[in-house]
């Protein structure tokens, strides 16, 4: 897919060996030369251009690490030290501060691909990778690729995120060397290329709105899980760290929509990052709404391990909203449900019932009973009813909920599994072990499928059940363990 017009001319010379960074020639025998990772070899390269390299060896090695072992960048840094006025320590500090956007006026001469030129370090890096030669569409793709995790992601998934009609543009970037790929069609950016793309394209909320919208859509598809959720969360984390926040309302909405999906998988690293980001922006009174501030307090309560502190946070969240409207009824309902759940955990059944029933009544009042938020609310309410010696009511509510989930989503999603687990728990609490086993098996079959690559999550769920009910936990756990080992 390369656009190099002279490639066909070069091939006519019948070369025995052709060195190129521009094309992927599948019809020929090829050998891939990768970056040199040996620090000693790269130090020798530095010494060839910088006469005092031995004197400052430790600093020079840190410079090599900072430019990600890229031979051309190492050579540039060495020549800058030999001919410029910067000391190794000053250059290292500048590199660590600005990385690929180094603004150094010292002119250096270098030969690359047969051409001699003078430029600053910054200009040389950009000349090497030819970012200016990319089409506008390719620059947009590079801009969004900056957020991918270091391990990369499926090219087809990324194409869907950007709503690209074909893989052609990405394939072109792969052939020119800007995008790395593996045999499994995973794409990523070399760290140095990523830094150049960041400094050149300056990704922002506005320019990357398609990507942000796509990630939010996935997070809002309640009951539908994706097997690449960890890479999705890592991408969101990179967005938080790297993107220019030029549209604050849209950015806050992105954070608020991603957090619950992370909570679904207990991805605390990302949840904590979102909370810190929201706290940073919402400390200013001219940014955000009452609902934004209520959500921040609710998110903080989610990660708070002390019940009394979590209760205070939820009460403070409710206090942020003075008037309940159609726009905020869903949020207020969730806050009441969360507060009711905390009161239940902290041994206040009357307050728990009050807030749980308030949350469900708000959903009913504003015609919201069909939405996904009703799932955890009804499940928790059913558990509460069982604890209050009303298990039949709780089981009835959950059976209705199972039917709704199966009708509107499926019977192999995480929501369905959670309801089955809750049913199993209620039957266990009422000493109906055969029914408990049936529902736990249904739940664990789904957990095993969704968490196939993370057996520790299945084990944690099993341990959770054992710890809650030690009197029957070993017996049930052994049955579940036998059941799981028989799954294929």
Place the predicted regions along the sequence by residue.
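A conserved switch/coupling segment of P-loop NTPase cores
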Residues: 1-50
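Amphipathic alpha-helical segments of the small helical/lid subdomains adjacent to P-loop NTPase cores
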Residues: 33-76, 90, 168
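Loop-to-helix "switch" segment enriched in basic
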Residues: 42, 80-138
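Extended alpha-helical scaffolding segments used for macromolecular assembly and cargo binding
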Residues: 207-288, 292-294, 309
């Amino acid at each position: 897919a390369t656009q190099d017009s002279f490639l066909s001319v070069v091939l006519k010379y019948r070369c025995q060996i052709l060195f190129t960074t521009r094309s992927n020639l599948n019809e020929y025998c090829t050998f891939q030369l990768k970056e040199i990772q040996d620090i000693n070899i790269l130090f020798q390269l530095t010494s060839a251009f910088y006469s005092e390299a031995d004197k400052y060896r430790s600093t020079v090695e840190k410079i090599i690490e900072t430019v990600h072992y890229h031979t051309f960048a190492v050579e540039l840094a060495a020549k800058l030290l030999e001919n410029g006025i910067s000391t190794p320590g000053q250059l290292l500090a500048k590199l660590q501060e600005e990385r690929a956007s180094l603004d150094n006026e010292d002119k250096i001469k270098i030969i690359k691909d047969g051409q001699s030129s003078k430029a600053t370090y910054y200009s040389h890096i950009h000349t090497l990778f030819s970012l200016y030669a990319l089409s506008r569409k390719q620059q947009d793709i590079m801009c969004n690729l900056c957020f991918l995790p270091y391990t990369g992601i499926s090219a087809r998934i990324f194409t869907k995120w950007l709503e690209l009609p074909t893989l052609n543009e990405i394939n072109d970037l792969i052939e020119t060397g800007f995008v790395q790929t593996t045999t499994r069609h995973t794409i990523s950016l070399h760290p140095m290329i990523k830094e150049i793309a960041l400094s050149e394209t300056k990704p922002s909320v506005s320019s990357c709105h398609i990507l942000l919208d796509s990630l939010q859509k996935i997070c809002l598809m309640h009951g539908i899980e994706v097997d690449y959720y960890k890479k999705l969360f890592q991408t969101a984390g990179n967005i938080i760290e790297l993107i220019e926040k030029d549209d604050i309302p849209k950015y806050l909405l992105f954070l608020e929509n991603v957090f619950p999906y992370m909570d679904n998988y207990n991805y605390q690293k990302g949840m904590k990052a979102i909370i810190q980001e929201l706290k940073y922006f919402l400390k200013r009174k001219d940014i955000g709404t009452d609902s934004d501030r209520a959500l921040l307090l609710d998110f903080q309560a989610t990660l708070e391990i002390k019940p009394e502190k979590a209760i205070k946070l939820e009460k403070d969240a409710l206090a942020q909203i003075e008037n309940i409207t159609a726009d905020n009824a869903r949020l207020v309902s969730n806050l009441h449900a969360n507060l009711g759940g905390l009161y239940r955990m902290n041994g206040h059944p009357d307050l728990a019932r009050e807030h749980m029933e308030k949350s469900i009544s708000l959903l009913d009042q504003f015609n919201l009973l069909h939405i996904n938020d009703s799932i955890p609310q009804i499940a928790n309410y059913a558990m509460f009813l069982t604890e209050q010696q009303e298990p039949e009511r709780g089981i009835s509510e959950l059976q209705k909920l199972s039917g709704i989930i199966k009708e509107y989503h499926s019977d192999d999603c995480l929501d369905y599994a959670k309801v089955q687990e809750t049913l199993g728990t209620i039957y266990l609490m009422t000493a109906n072990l055969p029914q408990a086993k049936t529902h736990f098996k249904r739940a664990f079959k789904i957990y095993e499928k969704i968490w196939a690559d993370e057996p520790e999550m299945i084990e944690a769920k099993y341990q959770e059940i054992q710890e809650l009910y030690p009197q029957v936990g070993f017996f049930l756990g052994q049955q579940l363990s036998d059941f799981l080992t028989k799954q294929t």
